């Protein structure tokens, strides 16, 4: 499994201008089965994606296709880890998490 960390290197108005393209990219990766969960960091200085499948090199290549990265608006870091435990109620916990803008 992988943690993909995006860190913005541009002002939020430039990030917001690329948000539609970023969301299309995310939908494509969810449809492929690669991405499991994603969201913005708090404070809003980037985002986190949990991904699965493939090699580190493949995931790094996919992460570098993010429009925020290709437009020079964010840096990306990929961390590989082996998940050894999970909460039985992970879906309910994600859904119960309070929304913060």
What is each stretch, according to the model?
Residues 1-101:
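Conserved, structured core segments of small domains
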């Amino acid at each position: 499994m992988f943690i993909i960390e995006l860190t913005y290197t541009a002002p939020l108005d430039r990030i917001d201008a690329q948000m539609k393209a970023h969301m299309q990219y995310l939908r494509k990766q969810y449809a492929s089965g690669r991405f499991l969960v994603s969201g913005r960091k708090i404070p809003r200085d980037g985002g986190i994606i949990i991904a699965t499948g493939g090699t580190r090199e493949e995931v790094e290549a996919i992460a570098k296709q993010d429009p925020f990265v290709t437009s020079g608006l964010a840096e990306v870091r990929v961390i590989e880890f082996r998940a050894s435990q999970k909460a039985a109620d992970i879906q309910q916990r994600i859904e119960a998490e309070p929304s913060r803008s």
